[in-house]
Amino acid sequence: MPGSAGRTGEGRRPGGHRRELHPRRRAPRPADRAEPFAALLAQLIGTAPAVTAVPSLAPSPPWTGWDHSGSGLWPDRDDEGHDLNEVTGPAWVDEAARLVRQQMRRCDAPDKIGHGDWESQNIEWQNGEPLAVHDWDSVIAQPEVAIVGLAAAVWPAAGGPGEAASIAQTEDFLSAYQATAGATWTTGQIRLAWTAGLWVRLLNAKKDAARGGGPQLDLLGVEIEQRVARAGLHTGDWLSRGSGLAR
């Protein structure tokens, strides 16, 4: 990581495989508040090199890949090697993903470099200060609102099934990031952040659906109406008919 925001705990072997540079230590993390996680991400984005100064970071990992170049709705392969385009339904998940891609593609903000897997399980702390950040094969180049929105949707996840940010935790992260970065986002920017964050939650829900169900699908079924509303997506009546099936 650039600057003093922490150090990487992983490296690359030839061929792109990761290796541990030191045993991962489970240092106590800050109290479950968004501010430290948002501030660390703001420091990373603010000190990262320009996108033009590094080799291409495309394609984005599937869970961040609303910007993928495949011909289907979903990336050609998810992070487990499966083609989610071959999985039928749920219809509300597919329709929401379509709307997310449609809205995000209209975002013309410049790309920045950030971390695309900003979950608490990938960040170590010591005495309330960042000690190490892991999973550097998840670095992405996307608009700032997208990077932050993706993080805001998942930051509390510590590796357990079904873990993700609640609606309130997502709101707290977005507010904390703006405060740390000294920015006041427009309504449109905030909606784009919610939209990008919805992508990772939808992909996780779709993966659960491929397995016949699971906690990510169940959780998003409860939250979907609030998340699409905050994203400003126009859903028609498919949402009220479809999401209830996931509850």
Where are these regions (language model features)?
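N-terminal membrane-targeting/anchoring modules of bacterial envelope and secretion proteins
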Residues: M1-P2, H22, P62
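All-alpha amphipathic helical-bundle segments outside canonical DNA-binding/catalytic cores
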Residues: T184-A196
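ATP/Mg2+ or Mg2+-diphosphate-binding catalytic cores
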Residues: L73, S175, L202-R247
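A cross-family kinase active-site recognition segment
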Residues: A27-T88, A109-D111
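Active-site acidic catalytic loop and adjacent metal/ATP-binding pocket
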Residues: R101-A146, A158
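Mechanochemical coupling/switch segment within NTP-driven translocation systems
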Residues: P90-V100
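Conserved structural core of kinase catalytic domains
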Residues: A5-P36
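Active-site activation/catalytic loop segments of kinase-like enzymes and analogous catalytic loops
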Residues: V145-G182, A196-P215
